[in-house]
């Protein structure tokens, strides 16, 4: 077991932060100024110059939004596991960078959490020190009332990372509850959802009594991770915050090489298409994610180095569940190339138009689903088109477009079979909304998504 050395901001700074609402950040302990490790490039003078185009290192950020119900224990364990894996040696400009943004409730004891007061999120850097130590270097401490499930906070963290750690490439793992493309508040209370346009970037606040129904992910069965969900209970009411998919995408200030979601139900074509232009590869699950999530002990071995390999993370994720039994053998995952989505959109637009009537009359029980209970907003993209009546040549064209953008996909034969789960007989690598089993108010929101604008699934 590696030992952990924590370098934190001074006590005086911490005390000042406790009485202020201003974020406290420090510049990274790196040498030199300007850019990362670069090769000398001949200039017009006798002295060699350096250029930012020759950056060598990669940056990995784990954004762990854990001030929520059910999963703080697992998110804390994920970070602990991350510290046992391979880490860069030191903090020089030549070294890769591992950053962790974590926001957990206050820990009472063991795995008991206090939601009645706010707790400060922290951004820190992990690296290997001397004698096998793991150094946790605190970079930023944010105000206790910070909402991590907000586009504003996500943008602030990513902007800091981009500015302070110039690099060849950037990647992010997002770990929290999530509900795919669905608008804020819809997943847990679809019957009361009414679509209303809201200002971009504003997280949704829901205030209710403490005896509100449990979120879907807290119902019977193994604990699951279900974009961002902050939960506070400061008094005789409950306050929850969620982030909109469109705002999430807009908050990313630079193009990421990869974005991996350790969160439920994010594996939809709607999510991938909304992130087109924001990341090269996206890895996600079409169904829920059991709370243990990714294999954080091996994660850095795939994502650091000259050529990050996010597919390795997806492969490890699937394999760790596929060897189990019963409910625990439950996983869906795919890795998608977001730069290759246009051919799929073109084929789907044509087929959606041709088979619109039959798609709008599809019977839910005949199409591969990825949901439990009554959360019927996630079906298999390919299976919908097949059940709508597409012929063999059309399905071949659809499969060709899928093969072009889906780099990797895997699914267990069943998903939570003893907890209202389902069999997996068809797996295209994408889930999708099925209007035939949809919701009028959800249709209104769905029309605002880039996937619908490109394909007119919902007219």
Predicted segments, located by residue:
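Bacterial Sec-dependent N-terminal signal peptides
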Residues: 1-3, 20-55
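Bacterial N-terminal signal peptides that target proteins for export
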Residues: 2-13, 285
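Loop/turn elements at helix/coil->beta-strand transitions in domains of secreted/extracellular proteins
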Residues: 56-59, 91-98, 165-171, 253-258, ...
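Solvent-exposed loop/turn segments at secondary-structure junctions
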Residues: 66-70, 104-108, 146, 176-182, ...
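N-terminal carbohydrate-binding/catalytic regions of secreted carbohydrate-active enzymes
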Residues: 71-110
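Surface-exposed loop and adjacent secondary-structure segments within mature catalytic domains
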Residues: 103-139, 173-234
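Functional beta-strand-loop-alpha-helix junction segments that form "active/interaction loops"
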Residues: 128-163
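Terminal, contiguous helix-loop blocks that mediate binding/assembly
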Residues: 199-459
């Amino acid at each position: 077991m590696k030992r952990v050395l924590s370098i934190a901001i001074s006590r005086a700074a911490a005390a000042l932060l406790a009485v202020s609402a201003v974020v406290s950040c420090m510049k990274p302990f790196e040498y030199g100024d300007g850019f990362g490790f670069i090769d000398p490039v001949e200039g017009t003078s006798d002295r060699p110059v350096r250029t930012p185009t020759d950056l060598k290192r990669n940056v990995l950020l784990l954004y762990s939004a854990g001030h929520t119900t059910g999963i703080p224990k697992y998110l804390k364990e994920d970070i602990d596991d991350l510290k046992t894996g391979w880490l860069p040696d030191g903090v020089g400009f030549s070294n890769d960078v591992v950053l962790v943004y974590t926001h957990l409730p206050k820990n009472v004891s063991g795995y008991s959490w206090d939601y009645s007061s706010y707790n400060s999120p922290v951004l820190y850097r992990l690296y290997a020190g001397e004698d096998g130590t793991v150094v946790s270097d605190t970079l930023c401490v944010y105000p206790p009332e910070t909402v991590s499930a907000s586009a504003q906070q996500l943008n602030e963290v990513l902007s800091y990372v981009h500015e302070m750690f110039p690099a060849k490439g950037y990647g992010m793992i997002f770990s929290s509850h999530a509900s795919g493309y669905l608008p804020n508040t819809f997943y847990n209370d679809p019957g009361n959802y009414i679509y209303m346009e809201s200002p971009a970037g504003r997280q949704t606040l829901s205030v209710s009594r403490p005896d509100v129904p449990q979120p879907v992910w807290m119902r019977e069965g193994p604990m699951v991770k279900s974009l961002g969900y902050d939960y506070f209970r400061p008094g005789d009411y409950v306050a929850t915050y969620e982030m909109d998919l469109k705002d999430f995408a807009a908050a990313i200030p630079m193009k990421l090489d990869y974005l991996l979601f350790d969160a439920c139900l994010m594996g939809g074509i709607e999510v991938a298409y909304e992130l087109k232009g924001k990341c090269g590869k996206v890895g996600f699950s079409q169904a829920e994610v059991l709370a243990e999530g990714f294999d954080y002990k091996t994660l850095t071995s795939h994502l650091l180095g000259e050529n990050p390999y996010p597919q390795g993370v997806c492969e490890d994720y699937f394999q760790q569940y596929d060897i189990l039994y019963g409910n625990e053998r439950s996983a869906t995952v795919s890795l998608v190339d977001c730069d290759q989505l246009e051919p799929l959109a073109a084929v789907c637009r044509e087929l959606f138009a041709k088979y619109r009537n039959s798609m709008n009359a599809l019977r839910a029980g005949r199409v591969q689903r990825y949901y439990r209970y009554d959360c019927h907003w996630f079906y298999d993209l390919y299976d919908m088109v097949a059940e709508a009546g597409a012929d063999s040549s059309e399905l071949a064209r659809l499969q060709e477009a899928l093969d072009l953008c889906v780099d990797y996909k895997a699914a267990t034969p069943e998903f939570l079979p003893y907890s209202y789960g389902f069999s997996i007989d068809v797996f295209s690598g994408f889930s999708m909304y099925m209007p035939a089993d949809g919701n009028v108010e959800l249709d209104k929101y769905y029309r605002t998504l880039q996937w619908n604008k490109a394909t007119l699934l919902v007219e």
